[in-house]
Regions:
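Cytochrome P450
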Residues: 1-346
Length: 346
């Protein structure tokens, strides 16, 4: 039996199971994408998905260089960076003072949201905190309404970076125009950051010993953020098109073909990360495919929001723990995150 191929495919991997039954749009992938990813990595590192009409690429050794290289073309519009981006494409450079002031805005916003939950018997962190903090921070910093920011934000916005608001439209925000411009440039990532925050809190609540370590050593929040982005990235699938023939494990993607780079699979590849399903904030292996490179303003803002979020929650709710009905089940296809996180604030 050979892999189902599109017309004109160059070469394809030799499967050990029925590849035609495997699809990113199938029930198995929806039910447990991580088990689906394991099957792909082990048996079908390059698989033609007839339903998706794209090649699925699942191994880290293939996904990472493909994301960083120039053989795959992506959309011309959207966020400046994404998983695996080596260098930020954003020409705007924010001064360090803008990041510091934006952190102050984010910290105030996070503490307001956290205090609202502190006296409750039970709360949903996704609905009442994680979704609000990134957008609320941007709204406060820019002077734009929450609805206006939400209208700009999304995992794949259909507008160019040049469409950011003009400085004259941002004078009502806290911290001045510099902070407002930085926040506005990061609005595209607000929804993704909210999903990443939900995954971070899910990982910490599911690992109480590591949550206690964070309480004792808040400086570890950054490491926890990086590890959560590896284990549960907000972006699971990056869609691209091959501009030339591209060699992968098990075959070659022909020029012009659609390619689905499975970031969620690559970040749990045991050939790259030891015990990849485990959340370990002391993990030292670098190279996780996350939100963007270190020089990306949006990635830096997302990290400072994560630090402010965890600090505010643990300050306002020293006894924060998972509720009895805690079930951090993820949902989504291209992007994934828990849709509910029930906790006991006290």
């Amino acid at each position: 039996m050979t892999t189902v191929q599109p017309p004109g495919a160059a070469t394809a991997p030799e499967p050990t199971t029925r590849p035609e039954a495997l699809s990113l749009l199938g029930a198995a992938a929806r039910h447990d994408p991580y088990a689906f990813y394991r099957t792909l990595r082990a048996e079908h590192p390059l698989l033609w998905d007839a339903r998706l009409e794209a090649w699925l690429v699942s191994r880290y050794a293939d996904v990472a260089p493909a994301l960083a290289g120039s053989a795959l073309a992506g959309p011309r519009r959207g966020p400046c960076c994404g998983p695996g981006t080596v260098r930020c494409a954003e020409e705007y450079t924010a001064p360090e003072s803008a990041f510091a002031l934006l952190r102050e805005v984010c910290a105030r916003t996070a503490h307001v949201l956290a205090r609202r939950l502190a006296g409750r018997q039970e709360a949903d962190l996704v609905e009442e905190f994680c979704r609000w903090l990134p957008t609320g921070t941007i709204a406060a910093a820019t002077g734009l309404s929450y609805a206006a920011v939400m209208g700009r934000s999304g995992p794949a916005p259909a507008r160019s970076r040049a469409e950011a608001p003009a400085a004259t439209d941002l004078g009502r925000g806290r911290g001045g125009t510099g902070v407002a411009l930085l926040a506005a440039r990061c609005a595209d990532q607000a929804v993704l950051t909210g999903r990443a925050l939900a995954s971070l809190m899910a990982n910490l609540l599911a690992n109480p010993e590591q949550l206690e370590l964070i309480r004792a050593v808040p400086a570890l929040i950054g490491q926890a953020w990086e590890e959560s982005l590896r284990r549960n990235p907000p972006v699971h699938v990056v869609l691209r098109r091959a501009t030339s023939d591209l060699a992968m494990s098990g075959g070659t993607v022909p020029a012009g073909a659609a390619v689905a780079l499975l970031v969620g699979a690559a970040n749990r590849d045991p050939d790259r990360f030891a015990d990849p399903d485990r959340f370990d904030l002391h993990r030292t292996t670098a190279g996780a495919l996350a939100l963007g490179p270190v020089d990306c303003p949006a990635a830096r803002v997302a990290e400072l929001q994560a630090e402010c979020a965890v600090h505010a929650l643990l300050t306002a709710m020293p006894g924060l723990r998972a509720a009895d009905a805690f079930d951090p089940a993820e949902s989504g296809l291209l992007t994934r995150a828990p849709h509910r996180l029930l906790v006991r604030p006290s």
